[in-house]
Amino acid sequence: MYSPYDFAIDPDMSKNYFTQAHRNELEWNFNLLKKKFIDKGYYVVITEMGATDKCNTEQRIAWGTFYVQRTRQLKMACVVWDNNSWNTNWDANEKFGLFHRDKGTFEPDSYVNALINAAKY
């Protein structure tokens, strides 16, 4: 679930700040999933989530930490998307690369660590 759209997947580089309105939208989506599935005894796995790289690592950390912690609190699991595509020229169109398969390293390491730490809560 790439939400909110303008922060998470819209390639517009100017939409690079994670706002309270974005938090509210995520909260609404998560609560809808909880009401429709969790409260009825079904498991929820969000099989794709991520925020395209707009050269805004700190904002992606804030988004990812909120996203993962909140889904964990609601008893949901999520899977981060990595498409091996990197932002190298200020083009944020589908730049979800996290793991350099050729080097065996993560980038940005701080974002990946934030997602992992948020899952531990």
Can you say where each PLM-predicted feature lies in the sequence?
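Aromatic-rich peripheral "rim/lid" segments of glycoside hydrolase catalytic domains that contact
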Residues: 56-121
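Extracellular glycoside hydrolase catalytic/binding regions
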Residues: 1-73
